[in-house]
Each structure stands twice: as C-alpha cells, then as structure tokens.
C-alpha cells in the first residue's frame, strides 16, 4: 500500500534580512505563504533500497536531490532497514524562489514517517527538516507563517485569504548563494513591515497586502537580471493589485482578488520565454 502526497510551493509576501551570521547563513524575518501549485510524491515501501524516479519538469534523480537526502536522513536517524520507491511528479519550476526542492523534502519526511510507521512527532520532523534546508521547516508546516532565524523558527498565522496569484518564471535560474553574496545590509531598500502585513492579511485587505509587499533581495536580483523589472511592469499593466519577486527569484508574482481573476488576467500576458501559471493561496 503506497502513499500519495501533494508538496505545495510557496511565495514570500515579505522578506527581510536582519544580519549575517558567523556560519555564513543570514538571519531573516519573512512571511511565507503556501500556494496551490504543487508537486506530487507517490511512495511505496520496498526493502532497504531508496529509489527515485521523476516525471514532468526535468530535475536530477541523483544523490543531491533533496528527496533522496530527506529519505536517507530519516532512514539513518530512525535506524530502520525499510526502503522506499519514490516517484516525483515535478510541476514546480526549479531554482525559482518557490521552494520546489524544499517542499519535496518536507513531503518525503512526512510520507516516510507514515509509511514506515516511525511515529516521529511534528517537532522531531521539524528538527530533521532544518538539517535539509532553510525553507524545509515551513514547507513541512505549510499555510501562512512568519519565519525567523534562518527560516526554521515559525510563528503560525491565521490562514490567508485565497487571493489569486499569477506566477512568471523566466527561462533562467538564480543562485540563492549569489544573491545573498550581492546583498549589502547597509544599503537595503524598502524594508518589510511584518506587523502591518499580518494586520492586512487578517483584515483580508488585498490593497493593503499589496502595499506591504517587500523583499530586500529583489534589488540584488534585479541588478543581475533587469528583465525582471519588465515582467513586474507587465503584471501591473494587466491588472495585478500587487507585484513582488519571491525569495531570491527569479519568479515574480502578481496578486489578484481570487483564482478566477488570476486565470482571466493570465490570458493577456505574453508568455515568450517564461513559464506562466495561475495559482492561489492555500
């Protein structure tokens, strides 16, 4: 008997970088939001071996895939001889700022904990998730949350309204490490106001949510890839209420009042050289 799980992507409604730590990581404060766009993992038990196959968007099934890393970490920590055959249907663009790899790792931890009957608590899984990447703990929890530390310290918020989202992922990827290297903490632009964004979400005020969108990494990635500014402008022109880059990029998203509006507006968007999708907050 196998298990089938959805692994939802995320966007950042705010992203602030507070400090650089001695270990090279950065202290952040950000509001993260799960979105309807998701990968699908199908997991079946087999003896000892862990194998991975992938369909959909092309990604490596080699050892550096976070699905395999998560499975092997759980296998090692649990001391189990059980294995798993994992199939990943990849729908979330890679190197996009949408946590595509992180959410697959989180779903793997969740799925194998159930399949192998390990009985690990959510907190135990969260500690393992932190070892796999800064976005993995949020992806494990999902929903709407403030993330602090390197992203592992989560404060769950009330679920956000199901605002519509248009996602535009250019053909190029972006290295998160390079973006952070290009960040100058003394020269940050608009800083997010976390409290104001939380209030806007609670009041379901799309206009105010749009005004509070802020990501201090955006200016760095825009310098590297000026085309992103053009994409932002097009999203504004077709009627998106607010526009921002997610994570370290390069995906840019536009907000609308609901999923139907996102689907309607997307028809007016030129798609040349970009991966364009309509989604909503979940």
Swiss-Prot record:
Functional note: Catalyzes the phosphorylation of the position 2 hydroxy group of 4-diphosphocytidyl-2C-methyl-D-erythritol.
Organismal lineage: Bacteria, Bacillati, Bacillota, Clostridia, Eubacteriales
Organism of this sequence: Desulforamulus reducens (strain ATCC BAA-1160 / DSM 100696 / MI-1)
- Which pathway does the database say it acts in? Isoprenoid biosynthesis; isopentenyl diphosphate biosynthesis via DXP pathway; isopentenyl diphosphate from 1-deoxy-D-xylulose 5-phosphate: step 3/6
Q: What class of enzyme is it?
A: transferase
Q: Which domain of life is it from?
A: Bacteria
- What EC number(s) does this enzyme carry? 2.7.1.148
Molecular function as annotated in GO: 4-(cytidine 5'-diphospho)-2-C-methyl-D-erythritol kinase activity; ATP binding
The active site annotation covers 10, 135
Catalytic activity, reaction form: 4-CDP-2-C-methyl-D-erythritol + ATP = 4-CDP-2-C-methyl-D-erythritol 2-phosphate + ADP + H(+)
Q: List the disulfide bonds.
A: none
Its protein name is 4-diphosphocytidyl-2-C-methyl-D-erythritol kinase
- Which BP terms does GO give this entry? isopentenyl diphosphate biosynthetic process, methylerythritol 4-phosphate pathway; terpenoid biosynthetic process
Specify one Pfam family: GHMP_kinases_N
Cross-referenced InterPro entries:
GHMP_kinase_C_dom (IPR013750), GHMP_kinase_C_sf (IPR036554), GHMP_kinase_N_dom (IPR006204), IspE (IPR004424), Ribosomal_Su5_D2-typ_SF (IPR020568), Ribsml_uS5_D2-typ_fold_subgr (IPR014721)
Residues the entry annotates as binding ATP = 93-103
Q: To which protein family does this belong?
A: Belongs to the GHMP kinase family. IspE subfamily.
Q: Which UniProt keywords apply?
A: ATP-binding, Isoprene biosynthesis, Kinase, Nucleotide-binding, Transferase
């Amino acid at each position: 008997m196998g298990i089938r799980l959805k692994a939802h992507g995320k966007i950042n409604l705010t992203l602030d970088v507070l400090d650089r730590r001695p270990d090279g990581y950065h202290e952040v404060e950000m509001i993260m939001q799960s979105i309807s766009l998701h990968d699908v993992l199908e997991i079946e038990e087999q003896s000892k071996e862990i194998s991975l196959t992938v369909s959909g968007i092309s990604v490596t099934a080699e050892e550096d895939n976070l699905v395999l890393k998560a499975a092997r970490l759980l296998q090692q920590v649990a001391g189990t001889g059980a294995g798993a055959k994992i199939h990943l249907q990849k729908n979330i663009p890679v190197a996009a700022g949408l946590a595509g790899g992180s959410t697959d790792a989180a779903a793997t931890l969740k799925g194998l904990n159930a399949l192998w009957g390990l009985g690990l608590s959510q907190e135990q899984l969260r500690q393992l998730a932190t070892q796999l990447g800064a976005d993995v703990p949020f992806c494990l929890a999902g929903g709407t949350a403030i993330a602090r530390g390197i992203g592992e310290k989560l404060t769950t918020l009330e679920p956000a309204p199901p605002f519509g989202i248009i996602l535009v992922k250019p053909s190029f990827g972006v290295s998160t490490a390079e973006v952070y290297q290009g960040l100058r903490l003394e020269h940050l632009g608009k800083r997010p106001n976390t409290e104001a964004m939380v209030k806007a979400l609670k009041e379901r005020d799309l206009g105010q949510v749009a005004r509070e969108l802020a990501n201090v990494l955006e200016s760095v990635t825009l310098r590297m890839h000026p085309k992103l500014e053009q994409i932002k402008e097009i999203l504004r022109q077709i009627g998106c209420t607010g526009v921002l880059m997610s994570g370290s990029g390069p995906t840019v998203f536009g907000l609308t009042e609901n999923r139907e509006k996102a689907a309607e507006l997307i028809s007016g968007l030129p798609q040349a050289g970009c991966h364009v999708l309509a989604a909503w907050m979940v």
